[in-house]
């Protein structure tokens, strides 16, 4: 049952070994938590893009970070992926502080008001993964992908849900913004 974990099945995730051409709508999704660094949740930033109906997780940063480390991580990911036109940041608690500081120096920071609870938000994005439309890096490209898959598989009963939150935020954005610009540029 979803309450016992297993909302996202391990076999749902498709793998990419070379970044596909023709990707569009590059975004970042951020879950910002900074408290006591030894026991706090993780700060997670993900880079996503899409091609047709498919969504691609391209990169991720994850760690227990202070406020200044979180700002530096977002600056770094934005510099590494300048094609990310939107940076989605949950406008709650720590995310609000990040938004206030970085929107003065990084373009495209979009405050996101979360809907429902974590389980509701995650469940709203299961169909695209179950349908085989979510691609994640192969393990030899991104060593962190194992932890991503395991956290997703354990949700909502796992110890952490920060990567789930980022995934849900990015894919809820794509679900709500289905316009495919690639049809105009091909």
PLM region spans:
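ATPase catalytic-site recognition across NTP-hydrolyzing enzymes
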Residues: 1-32
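Acidic two-metal-ion nuclease catalytic site recognized across multiple nuclease folds
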Residues: 3-4, 15, 170-186
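Mg2+-dependent endonuclease catalytic cores in nucleic-acid-processing enzymes, primarily RNase H-like
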Residues: 25-27, 44-155
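Generic detector of well-ordered alpha-helical packing
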Residues: 29-32, 91-92, 163
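An active-site-proximal beta-strand-loop segment
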Residues: 30-43
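Short, charged, surface-exposed loops that flank catalytic or proteolytic processing sites
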Residues: 137-138, 159-163
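C-terminal interaction surface of TIR/SEFIR-family domains
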Residues: 154-159, 169
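P-loop NTPase catalytic core of nucleic-acid-dependent motor ATPases
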Residues: 166
């Amino acid at each position: 049952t979803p309450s016992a974990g297993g909302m996202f099945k391990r076999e749902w995730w498709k793998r990419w070994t070379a970044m596909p051409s023709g990707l569009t709508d590059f975004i970042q999704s951020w879950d910002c938590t900074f408290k006591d660094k030894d026991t706090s949740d993780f700060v997670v930033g993900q880079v996503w893009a899409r091609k047709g109906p498919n969504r691609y997780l391209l990169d991720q940063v994850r760690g227990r970070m202070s406020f200044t480390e979180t700002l530096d991580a977002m600056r770094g990911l934005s510099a590494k992926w300048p094609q990310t036109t939107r940076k989605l940041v949950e406008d709650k608690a720590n995310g609000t502080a990040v938004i206030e500081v970085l929107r003065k120096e990084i373009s495209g920071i979009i405050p996101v008001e979360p809907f429902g609870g974590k389980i509701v938000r995650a469940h709203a994005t299961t169909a695209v993964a179950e349908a085989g439309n979510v691609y994640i890096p192969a393990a030899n490209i991104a060593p962190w992908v194992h932890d991503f898959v395991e956290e997703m598989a354990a949700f909502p009963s796992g110890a952490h849900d920060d990567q789930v939150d980022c995934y849900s935020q990015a894919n809820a954005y794509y679900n709500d913004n289905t316009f495919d610009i690639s049809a105009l540029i091909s």
